[in-house]
Amino acid sequence: MKLVIDDACYAYREIFDHFGEITAISGSDINANSVKDADVLIIRSRTKVNQELLSGSQVKFIGSTVVGLDHIDQNYLKTKGTQFFSAQSCNSMAVAEFVISTIVNLVDELNFDYQKKTLGIIGVGNVGTKLAEKAKLMGIKTLLNDPPRQIRENLDNFVDLNTALSADIVTFHTPLTVNGEHPSYQLLNENNFHHITNKTILFNAARGGVIKETIWKKHKTLANIIDCWEDEPNINPSLQNTAYLATPHIAGHSVDAKFMGSFMVYEALCTFLGKKQDKNIRNLINLSELSIDKSNLKDTLNEIYDFQQDANAIKDVNNFEDYRRNYPIRYEWHHFKSKTVLPIA
């Protein structure tokens, strides 16, 4: 069996080697010639999966080790009869930790009490749910907006989009969709940006394109935190230069998230092939407990991981892709023992 794998997939040799012959290629370099003889294709977000890539191939299984789906033509895969799996939820804890860590750092920067602020969470799926749980532990009031989920589950504790946009802190965690009853493409745009004021802290840790950047750069906010960009890796210099934190789409890049992305695809491939799983694969991320000797939450979180280093790394925007590919080691909070109680939910 021949496997073509994006070489940025975590521990791909250790996890997938026993399935067959591996060809590892940079995701942006995977093309029709690369996959024409492959049986399995395992990717991240930089490979466009469509008819152009696959029309001359024999690929039977495609696994994506990331959450985003806007680079996948799922309708074409269905017509071709190609099995597809995406590692949904693999990075949800990492993104929630990114948002909470940034809010805690902003407390000192802007001198506010987060327990007196409202947090508007737009998109309450895997990430939004975990973020809401952490916010509750910290005493932050949340305003939850997710029309598809609200309708599907008949939830009465959700709010409309304009109410969520009026929160003190607004953060987006939707997928990027352009069709359907509730498309998220340019969800925040010239028609509703007036709800965002010069007292709003605004996050995009969802997908580039959820916020219309040509409008965003014209509006004054209290602080912008931007991890996802419309035209990655060509990020908007005006927004980058005025942001409190501008990072290269790494909110979900914890070691745990990258491992789970690969592991979830491994599980799906085992199921597809009818193979028994190797229980030792899970041991690739087993760690001894790590200790931190800090006396407050901000210092503890920054000792675990200081996201400002990510912003500093892409002051030269040409470093965007290289930095993502060679991202520093970052473990999630549950690995750490600390004097300070961490909002682990």
UniProtKB/Swiss-Prot annotation:
Keywords: Cytoplasm, NAD, Oxidoreductase, Pyridoxine biosynthesis. Its main location: cytoplasm. Pfam families: 2-Hacid_dh, 2-Hacid_dh_C. InterPro entries: D-iso_2-hydroxyacid_DH_PdxB, D-isomer_2_OHA_DH_cat_dom, D-isomer_DH_NAD-bd, Erythronate-4-P_DHase, NAD(P)-bd_dom_sf, PdxB_dimer_sf. GO terms for biological process: pyridoxine biosynthetic process. SUPFAM superfamilies: Formate/glycerate dehydrogenase catalytic domain-like, NAD(P)-binding Rossmann-fold domains. Catalyzes the oxidation of erythronate-4-phosphate to 3-hydroxy-2-oxo-4-phosphonooxybutanoate. Its EC number is 1.1.1.290. Belongs to the D-isomer specific 2-hydroxyacid dehydrogenase family. PdxB subfamily. It catalyses: 4-phospho-D-erythronate + NAD(+) = (R)-3-hydroxy-2-oxo-4-phosphooxybutanoate + NADH + H(+). GO terms for molecular function: 4-phosphoerythronate dehydrogenase activity; NAD binding. Substrate binds at S45. It is an enzyme of class 1 (oxidoreductase). Homodimer. NAD(+) binds at D146, T174, D227, G252. Coiled coil: none annotated. It is found in: Cytoplasm. This is Erythronate-4-phosphate dehydrogenase.
